């Protein structure tokens, strides 16, 4: 098997150890690593890693072009990555070159927030009211509909780049920022109504249709406050109504993907509004940030990053543990 492994600069995933653990399960395993020269972790790779390719700017268009060229020449059987910024380009490569795994259509729904909202609607989930943003006129008009407006990057990750607008008076200051103007006029933002309810996250490891780890939790601090306060969350009581409802909604969302390849790991956010209903916020084809990975490892004994690696290679068995330890 030929594997192209992408390790983004901030990753500390122990890929060398995981590769050593599984390389004997293949008659011939060849791994090529695509990474950055400013990465946080420099590894000593096992013998099955035949080449490590470095780029100077991992997120750049030139790096993406280099990645596609590697796929074209190396012809990998699988591509492995756990980074949000890799989701779309890896899925596009899979679709373009006929490689198994998450494909472009569903990956787009996990990256573009506007496409994501429509996917949630199609799944029968409630969503926060939103509208597109192609200029300042759209932002002004949004205040005719909503008291508080949230300006979000369409392609953002987590809570980065989000701006809460309390009135039209907030706009003149933003209009003096060249980068903001450029992003507004190039359709890089969308607008949604501010939702003041509690925020929940659901973390998923998808093994197969009959074996899915679904772990609902409630944030102790809203994600939008991640720059002001230490964020954290608490797992919900498995016998509680909120747990059952989030389990149901998550299964309903996953079922709506039909015959598409499901992401190995997912991080989904819901809001609980004033009437007690859960409203879809966002979904991502990656693990959750902060200490969510460690929480799941403690509760279930599953490392989401390692599970993603193994699942991409078809090496996680159907009887993998999805039961929370007491």
Question: What annotation goes with each model-predicted range?
Answer:
Residues 94-161:
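A conserved helix-loop-beta module that forms one wall/lid of the active-site cleft
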Residues 51-59, 130-135, 163-165:
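Short acidic-hydrophobic, aromatic-tinged amphipathic segments that line or gate anion-handling sites
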Residues 1-105, 315-318:
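ATP-binding N-terminal substructure of ATP-dependent carboxylate-amine bond-forming enzymes
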């Amino acid at each position: 098997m030929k594997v192209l492994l992408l390790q983004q600069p901030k990753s500390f995933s122990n890929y060398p150890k995981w590769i050593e653990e599984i390389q004997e399960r293949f008659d011939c395993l060849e791994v090529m690593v695509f990474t950055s020269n400013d990465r946080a972790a420099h590894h000593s790779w096992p013998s099955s890693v035949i080449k490590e390719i470095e780029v100077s700017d991992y997120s750049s268009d030139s790096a993406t072009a280099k990645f596609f060229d590697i796929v074209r020449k190396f012809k990998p059987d699988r591509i492995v990555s756990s980074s949000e910024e890799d989701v779309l380009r890896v899925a596009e490569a899979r679709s373009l070159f006929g490689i198994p795994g998450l494909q472009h259509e569903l990956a787009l729904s996990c990256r573009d927030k506007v496409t994501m909202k429509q996917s949630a609607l199609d799944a029968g989930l409630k969503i926060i009211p939103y509208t597109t943003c192609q200029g300042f006129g759209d932002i002004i008009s949004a205040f005719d509909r909503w008291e508080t407006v949230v300006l979000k990057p369409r392609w953002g990750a987590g809570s980065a780049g989000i701006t809460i607008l309390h009135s039209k008076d907030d706009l003149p200051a933003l209009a003096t920022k060249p980068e903001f103007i450029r992003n507004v006029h190039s359709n890089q933002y969308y607008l949604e109504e501010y939702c003041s309810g509690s925020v929940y996250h659901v973390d998923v490891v998808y093994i197969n249709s009959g074996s899915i780890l679904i772990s609902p939790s409630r944030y102790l601090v809203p994600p939008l406050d991640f720059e002001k306060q230490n964020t954290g969350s608490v797992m919900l009581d498995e016998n509680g109504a909120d747990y059952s409802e989030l389990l149901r909604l998550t299964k309903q969302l996953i079922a709506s993907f039909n015959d598409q390849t499901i992401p190995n790991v997912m991080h989904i956010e819901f809001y609980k509004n004033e009437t007690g209903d859960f409203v879809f916020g966002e979904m991502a084809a990656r693990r959750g940030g902060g200490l969510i990975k460690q929480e799941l490892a403690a509760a279930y004994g599953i490392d989401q990053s390692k599970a993603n690696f193994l699942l991409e290679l078809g090496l996680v068995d159907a009887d993998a543990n999805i039961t929370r330890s007491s």
